[in-house]
Amino acid sequence: LNDENGEKMEKMSAIGAFEGIDITNSKALVDLKLDKPTAKDRDLLVEVTAVSVNPVDFKVRQGLKKSETPCVLGWDAVGTVVEIGEQVTDFKLGDRVYYAGEFSRSGSNQAFQLVDDRLVALAPSNLSDAEAAAMPLTALTGYELLFEKMGFIPAENANQGKTLLIINGAGGVGSIAIQL
C-alpha cells in the first residue's frame, strides 16, 4: 500500500482482536501487520518497548463487536520517541517516555504508537521499562480518586489533620494511592 504521497507504507507488528470472542479461542488475539503511522500535529511516534495489561484491556476486548478492522488494545506503555509532530515542543527524538493512551486511537500492543504529547511524560530513570509501563493508568486512577473525587489537595502539608484508611491496597491503584 502507498500513502497519500504515493510512497510505500512501512509495516509494523501488532496484536489485536476482531471481536470479543472467548479468550481461549485461538482467534481471540491475532498477530497483525499494520501500516506504521506518521507523527503530525501534537503526535509523538513512540517505539514501544514495554506495555502493561490492565482490567480495561480485558473488558474492552470482551465487548468488541465483530469487525473487519482490528482493535489494537493496550493503554499503558514505555518507549522511545522516534518521530515528532510539528506542534510538539516538550519532547525530543530519543526521549524515553511513558503514558496512558486514549480510547480513540490504537493501543500500545504494537511496535510503534502515536500518542498525543499532552498524555506523555519522561519515564523515571530509576525504573525498568516493565516497571514504568505498569504505572500510568494506575497512577492516574489513584491520583484522580484522591485529589479529584475525595477532595484531598496535592500539595505538601495541605492535608495535615486529615485521615484516610486504605484497606487492601495491594493492587496497582491501591498501592499508588497509599504512596500518594
PLM feature segments, named:
Residues 1-8:
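Short, Lys/Arg-enriched N-terminal segments with co-localized hydrophobic residues
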Residues 8-15:
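Short structural boundary motif marking the start of a folded domain
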Residues 54, 172:
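NAD(P)H-binding Rossmann-fold N-terminus in SDR/SDR-like oxidoreductases
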